[in-house]
Amino acid sequence: MLITSLRAFGVDVVLFFEVHQPYRLRPDLHRVFPSLPSFEEMFYGELDSAIFSRVAERVYRKSTKILLEAAREVGLKATFSVSGLALEQLRRHAPDVLDLFRELASRGFEFAAQTYFHSLAWFVDGEEFREQVEMQAGAVEELVGYRPRVAENTEFIYNNDVACFLRSMGFSTVVTEGVDWVLGWRSPNYVYKAWGCDARVLVRNYRLSDDIGFRFGARWWDQWPLTADKYASWLESTPGDVVLIAVDYETFGEHHWPESGIHEFLRWLPREVARRPRLRFATASEAAEGHQPRDVYDVPPWATVSWADERDLSAWLGNELQRDAFALLKWLYPYARAVGGDALRLWRLLSTSDHLYYQAIKLGPAGEVHSYFSPYGSAYKAHDIYMNALAALTALIREVWSREYAERLELDDERCFYAEGVRLCSLRELRSADGGFKRRHRDDLRRWLVDVFLLDERDADAALSRQP
């Protein structure tokens, strides 16, 4: 049976703006060693402040005022996804922008959830991912007064498990990339359903999005210059129920400088859309809930997609430098989790996807984009700096480690102790193990406690002797 739209005879235009600024690592971090660096010595505060101040003026203030003007005049709506790190820096450097965001929310704009640290936490630990999303959702609720209904994983990273995990957290709609091999013959311009759960999925129309995000200022492009009326006519002629246009918010004044005409494009686009009866602006949740899903968007975990580069994970995990760095980050997580406090905060800051993005080694347009964002000029330099930061985190953990933290340590599967069908992943489980089992494997267990739980030999012997 043909499923008809609940919002028939029109197309919902969903503008989705991604707002994120990382804390960049200081390139001369190695000079602090062997002393343990402070947060100020580790992160490049001067550069972050300079970049943020420039972007706040060119983008966050000017573009947001343009959107507010369009909201008042033609009823513009859109969806924002703001990382927790961007919110922190807005509070510090541009609190007036937060007031502008609150005014957007009061006029029907929507704010979505994502990971607080714009991180790769999904690939490390499910509960860590949950906590980071909850942190960011809480920050959004504090900002605009409601909990988000729409969520994305960092950089639109998506598979079926991501969608259903976010659905289990209460988010009704998940936003991701409209990948050709996933869609096949189908169009990105419809609402889909996640495989395995009832989450609704909106997928980005990457061609129309990249016309703004990447090609707007490209004089070699046969459609340059891109004007608001031309773009609105493309939207009007696009078949489907929903057109999701998702771009970095920094597109409007930073990636494309004001001299390119990008602000005038942003100013006139809502008006050009408003005068076309077939088009209407909607938030992501309105569009997802206003149309019945047409089919299933099926992305198995072994084929995870994103909106970057080749629509996969290669932007962050595509070469040996990146994979080695990420493996160490992942290895350190249980220890940072056990210690908490500054160690966990530092681990989370280092989980920000940008640090691995800077380590990509790519040619062509993708390589140019990586180079544009990197403050280091070289993937190899970015890797060295990041590994120094992980070394500093390791030193911090070792400096404060104690039996108390060993008691809190919950190991991943790779570091658990396995023998005779028994699996031990914590000191609590060790105490509950059969005494005969512990005697038979005493030497191996002792080495495990020293190497993995970082206990000295006396504490290791005590742990083996202790009963539940």
Enumerate the predicted regions with their spans:
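Acidic, His- and aromatic-enriched active-site or binding-groove loops in soluble protein domains
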Residues: D96-A113, E134, Y146, R167-V203
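Generic structural signal for well-ordered alpha-helices
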Residues: T64-L68, L98-R102, R130-V140, A163, ...
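Short, charged, surface-exposed secondary-structure boundary motifs
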Residues: W122-V124, V182-Y190, D211-G213
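Active-site and substrate-binding clefts of carbohydrate-active enzymes
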Residues: I3-R58, N189-A199, V203, A218-W220, ...
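Acidic, low-complexity, intrinsically disordered interaction modules
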Residues: L427-H441, R447
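An acidic- and aromatic-residue-enriched active-site/binding cleft used to recognize and process polar
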Residues: E18-P22, S83-L85, Q114-S119, N153-A163, ...
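CE4/NodB-like, metal-dependent polysaccharide N-deacetylase domain
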Residues: E128-I157, F165, S233-A246
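Short, well-structured secondary-structure segments
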Residues: D12-F17, P22-D125, R149-E152, S172-E177, ...
